[in-house]
Structures are given as C-alpha cells and as structure tokens.
C-alpha cells in the first residue's frame, strides 16, 4: 500500500511538472504572438495612415473649394487689395469652426492630411498675396503644411478649379498666363513635385 502511495506521489509530481512546463510554453508562445502582432502593426502603420489620408482628401478639398469660392465673392468690389487683412483668426477659423473634416483650435486649423496639427505643422494658413501684377492683398493664398504624399495630386486637382496659382514644395504647378489669364494645370507635374511622407507644402492662390 505504501508503495502504491509513493507511486501516486511520483505520478502527481510528474503531472504537475508537465502542466507547469506546458503553462510556461503557452506564455512564451503568447508573448511571441504579441511581439509578432506588434511588429506587423508597426510595419502596416504607414499604409493605415495613408488609407485614412486618402479618404480625407476629397472632403477636405471640397470644403476648401467652397471656402475659396465664397471668399472670392466677398472680395468683389472697388478695392484693389480686398484681401489685405485676411487671416486665420478673422476668416479661416470661423468658417471652419463647425467642420467635420478639419480640426479647429483657436486660430489654428489642422487639415488632418498629415503632420501633427499643432503650431504650423499640418495646418492651414490664409493670408494676402500679390497676383497678376497687383499689390499685396490683391489675392488670397491658402498654405497647407506637412501634407502626406497620399494626398498628391488629388488635393491640387480638386482645388485647381478655384486657384490661379498652385505651388508644391516651392515649385509652381500652375501659374498665370502672360496676360494674367488662368494657366494650365498638370496633375502629373503636381505628383512629381511631391515627396514621400508628411513633408509637402501646398499653396493655392486666387483673386
């Protein structure tokens, strides 16, 4: 009887050790799976971000298009510099305050197409520009900083209809003609001017 009890104790010990080893292997395997998932998420982050940027381009461009059209109508009159005092605090931020596309914080308008949306990173700024030989304030300009390359060239293509001048990273993608008539826009040129990442600056100007 004693021998049987001893055998049972040995068996129980072996079973306990086996369960412990199985539990250890399970934890190791679980940790490995979690690490693998983390790596896959890190690898796919740019693609995920690019997807969200692409889905926002259309709505963002449409809102800016409406804003520029409305602002141009307000600028019609006898003044040769109707946009001399245009700025974010008085014009852009109030117009976008209830936007579901942009994020407004005070006078800062984040476009959410790249960048942090803080300060001048990933934001939209409006200001007076000189167009067609006119003085400063004869036109208005919208500047979008830190735009992701996935927004190229869709953003510029949509805003082409309300812009007389478009530049991408400091290089003109559309300019006025020799007689100040609207110039031509090439989407391929705009695409070629873009660089990878949240490193693109767009300027759209009109009168």
What are these language model-derived features?
Residues 1, 42-45, 68, 96, ...:
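Detector for methionine-enriched segments
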Residues 1-3, 22, 34, 69, ...:
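N-terminal functional modules and adjacent low-complexity/disordered segments of proteins
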Residues 80-207:
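Periplasmic/extracellular, small/polar-rich flexible segments of pilin-like filament-forming proteins
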Residues 2-63:
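N-terminal single-pass transmembrane signal-anchor helix
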Residues 37, 55, 60-64, 69, ...:
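Generic alpha-helix signal with a bias toward terminal, lower-confidence helices
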Residues 49-96:
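Membrane-proximal N-terminal amphipathic helix
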Residues 14, 19-21, 56, 66, ...:
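Arginine residue identity/basic-tract feature
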């Amino acid at each position: 009887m004693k021998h049987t009890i001893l055998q049972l104790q040995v068996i129980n010990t072996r079973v306990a050790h086996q369960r412990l080893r199985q539990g250890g292997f399970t934890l190791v395997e679980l940790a490995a799976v979690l690490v693998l998932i983390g790596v896959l998420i890190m690898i796919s982050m740019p693609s995920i971000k690019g997807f969200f940027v692409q889905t926002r381009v259309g709505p963002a461009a449409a809102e800016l298009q409406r804003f520029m059209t409305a602002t141009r109508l307000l600028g019609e009159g006898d003044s040769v510099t109707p946009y001399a005092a245009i700025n974010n605090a008085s014009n852009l931020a109030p117009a976008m305050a209830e936007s579901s596309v942009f994020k407004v914080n005070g006078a800062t308008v984040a476009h959410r197409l790249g960048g942090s949306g803080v300060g001048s990173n990933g934001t939209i700024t409006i200001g007076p520009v000189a167009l067609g030989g006119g003085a400063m304030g004869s036109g208005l300009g919208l500047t979008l900083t830190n735009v992701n390359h996935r927004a190229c060239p869709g953003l510029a293509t949509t805003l082409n209809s309300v812009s007389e001048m478009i530049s991408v990273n400091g290089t003109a993608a559309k300019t006025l003609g020799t007689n100040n008539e609207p110039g031509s826009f090439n989407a391929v040129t705009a695409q070629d001017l873009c660089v990878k990442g949240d490193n693109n600056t767009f300027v759209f100007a009109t009168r």
